[in-house]
């Protein structure tokens, strides 16, 4: 994703926002464990100073990456509850400051806006509904 340097990142069936959050983490160089607590912190053989040094280095890389221009993010879903969950999960993941760079909307696949994406590099990723989320045959005709 970083090597492709997309101008647009789109998830047209964003569900709870996992792919958008992962893309944000990749493009802002945020280490996956940066905001987590780990059990090894209580281990007697744990080198606390080394761990804090590594975390500080990772945090510095993340802050530096946040200063760089990011693509425009689009997170769409036909289900309002999914849209709401995406917004909440982006905030919970620590990316509240970037909400202005993410268009999160209730939209169907047939209702895409004009992104002005002509001659732009776009990264499109999604996880289409399956299993219980799939729905009935009639409602899926337009999806598949």
Predicted segments, located by residue:
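Short loop/turn elements that form and flank the Walker-type P-loop nucleotide-binding site
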Residues: 69-70, 118-120
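Short SAM/SAH-binding signature in class I
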Residues: 120-127
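Glycine-rich S-adenosyl-L-methionine
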Residues: 135-144
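Short conserved loop adjoining the S-adenosyl-L-methionine
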Residues: 111-118
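A short, flexible beta-alpha/helix-coil linker loop
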Residues: 130-133
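Conserved S-adenosyl-L-methionine
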Residues: 1-111
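Hydrophobic alpha-helix-in-membranes signature
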Residues: 11, 127-128
């Amino acid at each position: 994703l970083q090597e492709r340097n997309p101008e647009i990142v789109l998830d047209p069936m964003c569900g709870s926002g996992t792919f958008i959050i992962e893309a944000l983490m990749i493009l802002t160089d945020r280490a996956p464990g940066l905001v987590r607590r780990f059990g090894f912190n209580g281990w007697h053989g744990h080198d606390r100073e080394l761990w804090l040094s590594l975390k500080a280095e990772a945090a510095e890389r993340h802050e530096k990456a946040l200063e760089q221009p990011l693509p425009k993010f689009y997170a769409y879903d036909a289900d309002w509850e999914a849209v709401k969950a995406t917004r909440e999960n982006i905030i919970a993941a620590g990316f509240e400051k970037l909400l202005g760079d993410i268009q999160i909307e209730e939209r169907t696949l047939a209702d895409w806006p004009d992104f002005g994406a002509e001659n732009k590099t776009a990264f499109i990723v999604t996880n289409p509904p399956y299993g219980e989320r799939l729905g009935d045959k009639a409602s899926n005709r337009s999806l598949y």
